[in-house]
Amino acid sequence: MPRVKRGVTAKARHKKILDQAKGYYGARSRTYRVAKQAVIKAGQYAYRDRRQKKRQFRALWITRINAQARECGLSYSRLIDGLKKASIELDRKILADMAVHDKVAFAAIAEQAKAALAG
């Protein structure tokens, strides 16, 4: 059986990692061993943060909805309860967008929620 020299595959593997680490600071973009660790860690952060992004945006939307709801005389939880009772199915992303860009429409929806809570 002939001897297999790994020069070509090793070079390709190193090049792949160093290409992924392009733009990293210092040895992280130049040294294979350090670059490999940096790329692995970056992948872990990316995986974790793709999940956290969803939580963070939902929290941001709730904060924005709450701020606008309080200007309309309701708390966030009372607003959501009122919307459910009024059978208004708007998700938090849309409500938050309305709270920022269309305060008049948000106020009208808040009034409907208030009416549903009262009646």
Swiss-Prot record:
GO terms for cellular component: ribonucleoprotein complex; ribosome. Belongs to the bacterial ribosomal protein bL20 family. The gene is rplT. SUPFAM superfamilies: Ribosomal protein L20. The keyword Transport does not apply. NCBIfam families: rplT_bact (TIGR01032). InterPro entries: Ribosomal_bL20, RIBOSOMAL_L20_CS, Ribosomal_protein_bL20_C. Keywords: Ribonucleoprotein, Ribosomal protein, RNA-binding, rRNA-binding. Pfam families: Ribosomal_L20. This is Large ribosomal subunit protein bL20. HAMAP family: Ribosomal_bL20 (MF_00382). Binds directly to 23S ribosomal RNA and is necessary for the in vitro assembly process of the 50S ribosomal subunit. It is not involved in the protein synthesizing functions of that subunit. PROSITE patterns: RIBOSOMAL_L20 (PS00937). Disulfide bonds: none annotated. GO terms for molecular function: rRNA binding; structural constituent of ribosome. It comes from the Bacteria. GO terms for biological process: ribosomal large subunit assembly; translation.
